[in-house]
Amino acid sequence: MDRTKSKSSGFLTLSAGALGVVYGDIGTSPLYTVREIFGGAYAIQLTQENILGALSLIFWALFIIVAVKYVVFVMHADNHGEGGIMALTALALRQRHRRKHRAWIISLGLFGTALFYGDGMITPAISVLGAMEGLGIATAALSHYVVPASILILLALFLIQRRGTERVGRLFGPIMLLWFLSIGTLGFVSLRQTPEVLAALNPLHGFRFLTAHQGLGFAALGAVVLAVTGAEALYADMGHFGKAPIRVTWFAVVFPSLILNYLGQGALLIRNPEAVQNPFYLLVPEWALYPMIGLATAATVIASQAVISGAFSLTHQAIQLDYLPRQRMVHTSESERGQIYAPAVNRLLLISVLALVLAFGSSSRLASAYGLAVVGTMVVTTLLALVVAHDTWRWPGLALLVTGAVLLSVDLSFLTANLAKLGDGGWIPLSLGLILATVMSTWKKGRDVLFARLQQESESLSRFLQRLTDEPPPFRPVGTAIFLTARNLSLPFALLRNYEHNQVIHQRVILLTMTTLDKPYAAEKEKITIEALEHNFFRITTRFGFMERPNVLRMLNLCRHAGLHIDLEQTTFFLGRETLIRSAERGLNRWEEVLFISMFRNAYNPTGYFKLPVDRVVELGTVIAI
């Protein structure tokens, strides 16, 4: 009985957490979606048939994209319980060994990842602006304070990131539950006054809407997609909460509340077309307007926090999988391993978000830029999930064809509609995606070229050990020397240089390789492998998941449990410090060389990244031409 109660309590806790983190973005979309369809740059004439058609498209977009695609299909593609586009890319690569196939999958994954960063810049700006615009509905005199108030809120949000959000995070679930109950109730009250709006659930209304307006109706899809922004979070945060809590909260709370609110806004527009200036806030009774603005502000801050945390987590994954240079990462919670703060990413997001708020000034103007980032990520997710369905799940060809045709037809329709908004701001996330994808691919390519150069100039471990047998070093100091080495280098460059210049080999030498697996967390039994070699050399391989932080001191404890005792006071860590210069040899293009060398110089030092004791580290420099 107690076990059942404990399981129920744990499930409810996870469900509340999912409400607070996963659904913040999609839950605040009613603030601007309907208004954008009928009052935005591609506004549709306000007639009852058009209102029913637009609401029908919103309902079926939520059902097909979120309920069917993400909740049923994509969430099945978990990488040992973890989700997100980097995890999906690693999963899609697992069965692909041809270089050309891997290159395409990596390019897709990197572009989708880059678009997610674009989403991370736009979500806080559009969400907080959308909430603050309620001030103009309350009284026209306050409309001038929308942008300044938004900037203050966003500044506070980004400045508290360094302290972590563990404490206030406990309030996210209850606040979002209150938000969903409130918007659902507001919609239901309006719906009861105009029940004929329920006809919008018939997909024929959506079809007629598109065919009747042709080009303009198709362009309106670019606004309809705003209703599904944040759908990617269902998959990205799966590792934190699990599939069941996310699925249950979607069908039990989020989906009904969203549909009720959208139908309620449509009912209001049928009764009062002038409400198009802000149908969300005009649903609210006058006495409840200020409390609702406060609740909406809290909900949009929570939505922004979820995206910011997602950007930190994605950066950590990209570094571990070697798609980005090392950066300083701070774990802000001792109990929650997913609580990460990336100072450089936080600064970049803050500057970008404030620039967007100042440049666009309203959620309506930002909506054009928003849709393209969201849909681009969705298309990439669909393609990668289809690769997994083919390679890993072994789906039959017909099932794969039908699923791909349905999902891609929806995704590509929304993508095409949003491409029409390139000139209105859609170029921002697209340009950002191309730039970031180029940065990540250049880093990956540059690292491969660098390791190839090191391998050329290095010596095989077996030959080096034979050299020690033939010509023993004149002096072997007491203690342990640990040399960090890449997975594809048999002999660390620092060891070779140290021996050539100093003719010194310590009494015990450990060659340490840290490998990142294509899954989030390494099992205890595979975390460490110890191999004894000649001349008191040891090769140690430690394995980490892409959600874990490499920690050398923790590795020393694992060695102790495995029977190899290492006294830290008698241990020196030798690191290679490579200085890169441009080479005449072909490997990277000239612009790639400049970019890679710049990133390499500015990467966070390995001493801090791997948590090495600074008083036990020796760096040996060398010049490498790439």
UniProtKB/Swiss-Prot annotation:
Keywords: Cell inner membrane, Cell membrane, Ion transport, Membrane, Potassium, Potassium transport, Symport, Transmembrane, Transmembrane helix, Transport. HAMAP family: Kup. It holds the Pfam family K_trans. It is a multi-pass membrane protein. This is Probable potassium transport system protein Kup. It is found in: Cell inner membrane. Belongs to the HAK/KUP transporter (TC 2.A.72) family. One of its GO terms (molecular function) is symporter activity. It comes from Methylococcus capsulatus (strain ATCC 33009 / NCIMB 11132 / Bath). The gene is kup. Transport of potassium into the cell. Likely operates as a K(+):H(+) symporter. The chain crosses the membrane at residues 11-31, 55-75, 103-123, 140-160, 171-191, 216-236, 250-270, 282-302, 340-360, 369-389, 395-415, 422-442. One of its GO terms (cellular component) is plasma membrane. It catalyses: K(+)(in) + H(+)(in) = K(+)(out) + H(+)(out). InterPro entries: K+_transporter, K_trans_C, K_trans_N, Kup.
